[in-house]
Amino acid sequence: MYSDPLQHACLAAAVVAPLVRRSGRGVLVAAVVPALAIDVDHAVAARSVRVGDITSLATRPRTHSALGALGAGAVVAAATGPVHGWATFAGLASHLLHDAGDRAAPTPVLWPFAPARQLGRARQLALSSALLIASLALSRATAAPWTEPLSAAAGDGGAASPPRTA
């Protein structure tokens, strides 16, 4: 069974999950849609939509690069803001890392600076974890300062009446 799209969607959602609480579900869309859509380049390169043809390329297309992910993230950031731009970059980067972690066709992650190659699952896990940690940091950095109500600060669970003046 061909499960790559499901795997890419789940990984993209996972690396931006810390952003959802503060920024809404739109960040999931900003991560998952590009992480799925990028594989259209396989059909273009193979000139076919058959799974056997698109998965048997000698190397993955050049759009499967960090440069492509950075470009897409920058475009989305300019259009919708930095959080959604990061989500787009992180979703695409998780896709590239997953592809570069397998033993299939080499992935041009560092194109045009280095030839296409595979990174292995250990590096995929480490770098995907770094994306998750960066999303957590961004979530905290964009959070509004937290303030507790006066009654909660008084230690009575918020049941106290407002403070009285003389």
Where are these regions (language model features)?
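N-terminal membrane-targeting hydrophobic helices
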Residues: 1-166
